[in-house]
A protein has these predicted regions:
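Conserved GNAT acetyl-CoA-binding A-motif
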Residues: 116, 123-135
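Conserved catalytic-core motifs of GNAT/GCN5-like acyltransferases
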Residues: 132-135, 143, 147-168
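A short beta-loop-alpha structural element at the N-terminal edge
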Residues: 16-29
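Acetyl-CoA-dependent GNAT
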Residues: 47-105, 116, 178-180
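Short acidic N-proximal helix/loop "leader" segments that mark the beginning
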Residues: 1-13
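Glycine-rich phosphate/pyrophosphate-binding loop shared by adenosine-nucleotide-utilizing enzymes
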Residues: 15-17, 75-81, 170
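A short gly/proline-enriched turn/hairpin at secondary-structure junctions
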Residues: 40-47
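Glycine-rich phosphate-binding loop
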Residues: 106, 110
Length: 182
């Protein structure tokens, strides 16, 4: 499954980047990527990746069977992080969850679409049947990326997530893709 990496991704306007799995040596680059994100992007992430200890833990405890992180690099820097989260046993072992974070300066070039497409392909190869993604309901560009990748909006949970900086609640959109229908 990972033998095809690294691979080049050609995006809109000829922009090119390299996709590959994260390795433990990515600590510095991954941390730089996360701290470069604007505060408005960071406030709705599930974890606080500006906490260096957290990123150190991610890089130290890599287990591709549970969390498969795919990075996009351009000119030596990380410009996107996408992760496929899986349960290895129990009632949810056929379902994966994906999370995608894209650097502001490379948005609107198709990188988000490409990262979602890449994780969907990896999930299918791993034998998963369904994928789930969550996005703040007001993040319409992100929701559109998922929908263009075959995800359906199945629910919107009202006032479900809280912006930890401004103490405001937001709605969250739940999107699902059925991999058995492709």
């Amino acid at each position: 499954m990972l033998q095809d990496y690294p691979k080049e991704a050609l995006l809109k306007d000829g922009f090119s980047c390299t996709l590959r799995p994260m390795i433990s040596d990515d600590l510095e680059g991954l941390y730089r990527f996360f701290v470069s994100l604007p505060e408005k992007d960071l406030r709705y992430l599930r974890d606080d990746p500006t906490d260096r200890r957290l990123v150190e833990k991610w890089c130290r405890e890599i287990n591709y069977d549970k969390v498969l992180p795919i990075l996009a690099e351009h000119e030596g820097g990380i410009i996107a992080n996408a992760t496929l989260h899986r349960q290895t046993s129990g009632w949810g072992k056929h379902v994966g969850e994906i999370r995608v974070t894209i650097a502001t300066e490379v948005r609107q070039r198709g990188l988000g679409f490409r990262m979602v497409e890449e994780l969907s392909s990896l999930a299918r190869a791993a034998g998963l049947n369904k994928l789930c993604a969550r996005a703040i309901a007001s993040q319409t560009d992100a929701i559109t990326v998922f929908e263009k990748n075959g995800y359906s909006l199945v629910a919107t949970l009202k006032n479900f997530v809280k912006d930890v900086h401004q103490d405001e609640y937001q709605d969250i959109a739940i999107l699902v893709k059925d991999l058995t229908q492709e």
